[in-house]
């Protein structure tokens, strides 16, 4: 078997992902009028040389360690996979009804739940190639994913081998399951619980993952006021939540395109052009073929990442931080190594995001902000001050020719980026972006059948002290309301999974 051609996030349909859909996509607000933009407008905003192009990498840092960029990508691959929608609008689907019908039938090959199906696949019997007995398969040297003789990673989602960093996140979750299985589950009496030892290890792995998504990743990147508002409802099963996300007519959770095509893609702005791999390779381009960061091949030992450069694992080593949450993209993301198109715009991820949102019939940021406000979220429509955006005159000239006014009807994706920049100075998501993330992630945690929320609320589950540390404080009030209180974070999972000591 030959290794697949590299295929990167947001570029093309995922290779090797031809399974039947397990769910569909949807609109949170199907009654809102879709906002359509032209290719010229999308290019002026998000194309090469457009207002979103950060040529010189001059954007400041956020306060989010760089490892969270790839963890967020891993989470995305756990809940969404669209292999059939087009980048450009269907000329026969301009009517809102047709767009909504198309989206409602658009298949999602991932389950809209934080169940780690990108790790576990369909289980040991249906996906035996992912397993080594009741362990998750890992490479013989312990530093790489298990691979076929041709180099293909044996994992639940081939996208998680598209670069070194996400591949190592995937490996960490294999190792986390294995260590929980070996060292934690056997110590507990599970004979009366109905769980097998494998099932108990899988459940613990999922619960720790879900906890970190809510109380580390989302708490870290979301507006604090919006986070507290949503988390108080997510963690109290007596309160109604989610407020607008709901199951479809088949009683399945769909994936809202406002989330998958706009809100979660704001995370692309966190990406830098270069990252430190380890002490020998302190500046490696994200898509550097010479260093193999393109993925889809075995990992040389010299390129094993030192996690201290990515997460706060060592008090003596300051990890690299992600780029600020603002309305510009790193140069690497504006010239993706895409195959099969001579259109320079198609290589710009920001352009692609804008065009895909238009094709899927997303409403404007202002319209969605009004709807989320009426649902109770603590937010207002943001004045984006577009006239003060650097190089906006180029966009204004294009808009003048087409007679379009984006100041009051801004594409949701760009609205969320600009909102983040204005609301927090680029430190985190703005209020609407935060509300959309928490509505959907919180909805998954409340509406899916097996998450940590109910056992945590009743006191029947807490994160393992051998993973979080013996002094970790999981008081719900502190978790919800206290900034910078992270008793279990991504660094703890990585430290335990990879058997690192306190200094990495």
Regions found by a protein language model. Name each.
Residues 177:
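Short acidic, glycine-rich surface-loop motifs adjacent to enzyme active sites
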Residues 1-159, 163-164, 182-504:
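Terminal regions of secretory-pathway proteins
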């Amino acid at each position: 078997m030959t290794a697949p051609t590299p295929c990167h996030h947001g570029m093309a349909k995922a290779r090797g992902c031809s399974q039947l859909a397990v769910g569909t996509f949807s609109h949170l607000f199907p009654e809102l009028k879709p906002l359509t933009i032209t290719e010229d407008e999308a290019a002026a905003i998000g194309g090469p040389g457009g207002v979103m192009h950060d040529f010189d990498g001059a954007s400041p840092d956020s306060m989010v360690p760089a490892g969270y960029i790839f963890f967020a990508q891993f989470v995305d691959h756990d809940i969404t996979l669209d292999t059939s929608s087009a980048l450009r609008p269907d000329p026969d689907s301009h009517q809102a009804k047709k767009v909504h019908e198309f989206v409602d039938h658009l298949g999602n090959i991932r389950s809209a739940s934080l169940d780690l199906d990108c790790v576990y696949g369909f289980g040991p019997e249906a996906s035996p190639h992912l397993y080594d007995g009741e362990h998750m398969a890992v490479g013989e040297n312990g530093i790489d994913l298990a691979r076929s003789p041709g180099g293909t990673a044996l994992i639940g989602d081939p996208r998680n081998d598209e670069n070194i960093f996400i591949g190592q996140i995937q490996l960490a979750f294999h190792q986390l399951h294995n260590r929980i299985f070996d060292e934690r589950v056997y110590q507990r009496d599970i004979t009366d619980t109905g769980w097998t030892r494998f099932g108990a290890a899988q459940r613990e792995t999922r619960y720790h993952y879900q906890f970190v998504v809510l109380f580390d990743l989302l708490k870290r990147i979301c507006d604090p006021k919006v986070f507290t508002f949503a988390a108080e409802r997510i963690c109290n099963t007596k309160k109604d939540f989610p407020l607008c996300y709901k199951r479809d007519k088949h009683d399945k959770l769909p994936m809202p395109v406002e989330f998958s095509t706009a809100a979660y893609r704001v995370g692309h702005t966190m990406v830098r052009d270069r990252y430190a791999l380890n002490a020998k390779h302190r500046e490696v381009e994200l898509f550097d073929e010479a260093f193999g960061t393109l993925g889809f091949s075995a990992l040389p030992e010299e390129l094993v990442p030192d996690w201290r450069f990515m997460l706060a694992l060592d008090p003596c080593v300051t990890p690299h931080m992600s780029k600020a949450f603002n309305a510009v993209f790193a140069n690497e993301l504006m010239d993706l190594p895409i195959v099969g198109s001579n259109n320079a715009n198609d290589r710009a991820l920001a352009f692609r995001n804008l065009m895909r949102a238009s094709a899927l019939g997303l409403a404007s940021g202002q319209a969605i902000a009004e709807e989320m406000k009426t649902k109770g979220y603590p937010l207002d429509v943001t004045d984006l001050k577009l006239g003060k955006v650097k190089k906006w005159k180029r966009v204004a000239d294009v808009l003048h020719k087409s007679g379009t006014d984006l100041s009051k009807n801004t594409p949701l994706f760009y609205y969320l980026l600009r909102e983040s920049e204005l609301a927090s100075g680029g430190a985190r998501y703005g209020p609407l972006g935060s509300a959309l993330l928490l509505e959907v992630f919180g909805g998954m945690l409340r509406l899916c059948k097996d998450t940590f929320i109910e056992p945590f609320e009743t006191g029947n589950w807490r994160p393992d002290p051998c993973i979080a540390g013996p002094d970790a404080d999981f008081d719900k009030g502190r978790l919800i309301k206290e900034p910078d209180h992270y008793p279990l974070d991504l660094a703890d999972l990585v430290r335990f999974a990879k058997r690192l000591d306190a200094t990495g």
